[in-house]
A protein has these predicted regions:
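Jelly-roll (double-stranded beta-helix
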Residues: 1-19, 26-36, 48-51, 55, ...
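Short amphipathic
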Residues: 38-42
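Structured binding elements
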Residues: 60
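A cytosolic small-molecule/anion-sensing beta-strand core signal
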Residues: 63-64
Length: 202
């Protein structure tokens, strides 16, 4: 994973060359007290974030370029100054449809889980663990991460996806995949800590 280091030692900008995605952390979870995350996301021409849903709310503002945004089955065109909100659990995704880079400013709740989940996902993409479409090559390894992150990938029906991912994640943990994540990706341990803190209400 390509990282630009900050004075504090954490990567302020992470890049995924497989899909032309660049994420700059404008306000990290640590800086917000874990309540929120603010990022700037830049997509290369044709770059896309596939349809998905998660427990966090995201507020999007288009800063440059043109994007085709899909929200709960509706198609929305975003241009500079346009905004859209994806509420928790609502399926959304977007694609850069311009011939130049497109940039979004995104404010998300569940800051710690969102940040560390993004960091692990991009690191795994760099390692070749995911396809450019965001699908895990090792189903058990990917399922453990998706389950811990509470990420839903469309278009599989939610009623089928959730028990399937839970079952695959349980099998993955039994087969040692979670230990692989813990060993290779320090941010995965931070993700687990954030999930446990939320579950305890602390």
């Amino acid at each position: 994973m390509s990282i630009d280091a900050t004075a504090g030692g954490a990567g302020r900008t992470i890049r995924d060359p497989t899909n032309g995605e660049e994420i700059t952390f404008l306000e990290t979870a640590a800086e917000s007290g874990e309540d929120r995350l603010v990022i700037r996301l830049t997509l290369a021409p044709g770059g896309a974030v596939p349809l998905h849903a998660h427990p966090a709310q995201e507020d999007f503002e288009c800063l440059e370029g043109q994007l085709a945004f899909h929200l709960a089955g509706q198609a929305i065109e975003l241009s500079p100054g346009s905004t859209v909100t994806a509420l928790p659990g609502i399926v959304h995704g977007f694609r850069n449809v311009s011939g130049a880079p497109a940039t979004l400013r995104i404010v998300a709740t569940h800051g710690a889980e969102m940040e560390y989940g993004l960091r692990v996902k991009v690191a795994m993409m760099q390692d070749g663990a995911f396809t450019s479409a965001g699908r895990p090559k090792d189903l058990l390894l990917g399922s453990v991460l998706l389950h811990r992150s509470a990420i839903y990938l469309a278009p599989m029906p939610v009623w089928l996806y959730r028990p399937l991912i839970a079952g695959l994640a349980a099998l993955g943990r039994w087969r040692g995949r979670e230990q692989v994540l813990r060993t290779r990706y320090p941010d995965y341990v931070r993700l687990l800590d954030a999930v446990h803190r939320r579950e305890r209400g602390t």
